[in-house]
């Protein structure tokens, strides 16, 4: 009888240790940064997004609502450039232009993970990696050839996350960003074909392809039955 009780206690102790070792701490926030490359589509480049690649750096902050849903604030700094000599389309009077610019962007985006993202806790069917889709709104400020402009942007795209460790995340994200302005490439290239631009018509686009590293913090309420 005593041996049976001792065996049960030993099994319970081992099970408790196993659960403690495999349990996943749940965190609310994720912060980090990344580097990558940029592309541009507009009056100085109408076809190949990567014909004049630039560079970008970014900082990110996520609120992780659940293993599937997150809100992300991103701050980007990057360079863009273009040259009409590379284009097959000819501008009026065979004019040639080139530009380079530095932009600053602040965006707020929604993320949806295709899998329950996380580690441990098999009953929640958590996966160590997940692809995701994302979209939102932003504001971009830039300086091109002495001209400083600003415009709203609509960033959207896809990405993938991988948990290197319990709280450390590696990510790769591609975003296309529609700028509600035709002056991202400067005033000289605004409406070169005399087709007047509107708020959403005949405006410039740019992209970012960014490799990110981030760290989770701020544990959720361990005794609550809901996500705070």
Describe each region flagged by the PLM.
Residues 43-48, 84-90, 121-124, 145-150, ...:
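Outer-membrane beta-barrel translocator domains and adjoining extracellular loop/strand segments
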Residues 27, 51-55, 102-106, 129, ...:
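Residues that define the transmembrane beta-barrel architecture of outer-membrane proteins
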Residues 33-37, 59-63, 108-112, 135-139, ...:
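Residues on the lipid-exposed face of transmembrane beta-strands in outer-membrane beta-barrel proteins
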Residues 23-62, 208-220:
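Short glycine/proline- and aromatic-enriched beta-strand/turn motifs that initiate or cap beta-hairpins
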């Amino acid at each position: 009888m005593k041996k049976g009780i001792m065996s049960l206690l030993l099994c319970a102790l081992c099970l408790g240790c196993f659960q403690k070792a495999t349990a996943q701490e749940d965190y609310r926030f994720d912060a980090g940064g990344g580097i990558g490359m940029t592309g541009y589509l507009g009056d100085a480049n109408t076809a190949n997004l990567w014909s004049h690649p630039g560079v970008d750096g970014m900082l990110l902050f996520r609120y992780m609502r659940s293993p599937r849903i997150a809100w992300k604030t991103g701050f980007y700094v990057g360079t863009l450039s273009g040259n009409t000599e590379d284009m097959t389309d000819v501008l009026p009077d065979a004019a040639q232009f080139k530009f380079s610019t530095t932009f600053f962007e602040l965006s707020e985006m929604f993320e949806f993970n295709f899998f329950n993202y996380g580690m441990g806790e098999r009953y929640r069917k958590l996966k160590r990696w997940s692809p995701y889709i994302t979209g939102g709104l932003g504001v971009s400020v830039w300086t091109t050839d002495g001209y400083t402009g600003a415009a709203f942007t609509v960033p959207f795209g896809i990405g993938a996350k991988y948990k290197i460790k319990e709280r450390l995340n590696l990510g790769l994200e591609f975003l296309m960003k529609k700028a509600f302005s035709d002056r991202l490439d400067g005033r000289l290239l605004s409406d070169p074909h005399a087709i007047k631009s509107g708020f959403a018509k005949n405006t410039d686009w740019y992209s970012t392809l960014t490799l990110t590293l981030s760290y989770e913090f701020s544990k959720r309420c361990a005794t609550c039955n809901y996500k705070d």
